[in-house]
Regions:
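ATP/NTP phosphate-donor binding region
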Residues: 1-93, 351-352
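A glycine/threonine-rich phosphate-anchoring loop and its flanking beta-alpha core
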Residues: 10, 114-217, 313
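Short Gly/Thr/Asp-enriched flexible loops that form oxyanion-binding sites at enzyme active sites
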Residues: 52-53, 83, 102-116, 148-149
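Acidic-glycine-rich active-site phosphate/pyrophosphate-binding loop
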Residues: 80, 169-175, 266-274
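Glycine/serine-rich anion-binding loops at beta->alpha junctions
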Residues: 91-109, 140-146, 283-286
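Active-site segments that bind and position negatively charged phosphate/pyrophosphate groups
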Residues: 204, 208-337
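C-terminal charged capping/lid subdomain of soluble metabolic enzymes
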Residues: 311, 317-398
Length: 398
């Protein structure tokens, strides 16, 4: 096991009455100023959640302002609007109500409010944040794990880039997690979330450092649990309210555990699939989970001979495949089992299923060049990928 630092300071309130703790948590972590309530749109309003939050804040004496309309693959322009609003209103805490896109936007706004330049500087590696507005979360879409992670991912529409920035400074101060809030999610969002949750662990599971026995066992347990829970929710019939709650609770907590470095540290993680997907969703604005499902099998087949035993473990211990004694065949069977799982959940495999058409060679080369930053950056720890490798994986998915 390698040496590591583990820092996860987010206070989590998990459970069916977790929303009742909101006023106390806001009081505990808010700086001087108003609360900015940040949210996406429809479901938060239709469910009455936004009204309940506003009532709690008002009755507790907190001044607040609202900003809605946060979209999937959150935009830099919206971050800029949020920064301007924070300067104008004097915001002391950002309350993100929603999923990863809302939380990522909140983190970016927090960083940018205390920075004289463009917040995009953090994402292109030009600067590092020195302060931020505290962020709190009311989670409604378990997927990205941003409620506990140090990550934020933002899309720049002008440059057609989707980039991440990681900083412990931006970790949410608290996360309120009520699995009932995820009951009304459409199947597509549930499936995208399950793919993303599993992928955050798979990016850490497929590593060259296979002597991390505890992390490996934890990862396999999490992957099995999410797969089985998603199968119940998406493929089961006449699921009882109790069984639905059990499955939704497991997925919501797995969302956080999968991306808080418990399953493996960043230094030993791969994340090439994430980097390649970011280029896809930057150009085509597809759901992140769907993009991951589309590209992962091609990555897996391209790199599996780096360590077949790891893929055999994945096949047998996660996907339930029988080991036939031939490592390559068993590894391939595990990848096919994952593809079958994606299809059961209504997720795409390959570009044709994701986009409705194949991608041109020109676009493949463009994405490979951007992903590798002109072949100066080679993502991947299980296998380091240069620009030609990345293009080859895109072609396999085509």
């Amino acid at each position: 096991m390698q040496d590591f630092n583990y820092f996860v300071p987010t206070e989590v309130q998990f459970g069916l009455d977790s929303e009742s703790y909101l006023p106390a948590l806001v009081k505990k972590y808010k700086r001087d100023g108003k609360v900015l309530v940040l949210f996406g749109g429809g479901s938060v309003v239709r469910s009455g959640l936004l009204d309940r939050i506003e009532k709690q804040l008002s009755e507790s004496g907190f001044e607040y302002v609202k900003k809605g309309g946060i979209q999937p693959n959150p935009r830099l322009t919206v971050v800029h609007e949020g920064i301007d609003l924070c300067h104008k209103e004097g915001v002391g805490l950002i309350l993100a109500v929603g999923g990863g896109s809302v939380v990522d936007t909140a983190k970016a706004i927090g960083y940018g409010t205390y920075y004289d330049g463009d917040v995009w500087d953090f994402y292109i590696g030009k600067a590092k944040a020195t302060d931020t507005i505290p962020v709190g979360v009311v989670l409604t879409i378990p997927a990205a794990g941003s409620e506990i992670s140090d990550c934020t991912v933002i899309s720049n529409e002008e440059t057609q880039q989707k980039l991440g920035y990681s900083d412990n400074l931006g970790r949410a101060k608290f996360a309120i997690m009520n699995p009932l809030l995820s009951f009304t999610l459409p199947d597509y969002q549930t499936a995208c979330g399950a793919v993303d949750i599993m992928m955050h662990t798979m990016e850490r599971y497929f590593t060259k450092d296979t002597d991390m026995l505890l992390q490996t066992a934890l990862a396999e347990a999490l992957l099995r649990t999410v797969k089985e829970s998603a199968d119940k929710l998406l493929c089961g019939k006449n699921l009882s309210e109790h069984d639905t709650l059990v499955a939704r609770s497991a997925i919501m907590w797995a969302s956080s555990l999968s991306h808080n470095d418990l399953m493996g540290g960043r230094g030993t993680s791969d994340f090439a699939t994430h980097k390649m997907e970011h280029e896809i969703s930057a150009l085509y604005d597809v759901a992140h989970g769907a993009g991951l499902a589309a590209i992962w099998p091609s990555w897996a087949r391209y790199v599996m001979h780096e360590d077949l035993s790891r893929f055999v473990d994945f096949a047998t211990k996660v996907m339930g495949v029988m080991d036939n004694g031939n490592a390559a065949e068993t590894a391939e069977a595990g990848i096919r089992a994952m593809e079958d799982c994606y299809h059961r959940w209504g997720m795409p495999v390959g570009f044709a299923e994701l986009l409705g058409e194949k991608v041109s060679e020109e676009t493949i080369l463009l994405m490979a060049d951007k992903c590798s930053k002109g072949d100066t950056f080679h993502p991947g720890y299980f296998k380091s990928l240069d620009k030609n490798d990345i293009a080859a994986i895109y072609r396999l998915a085509n």
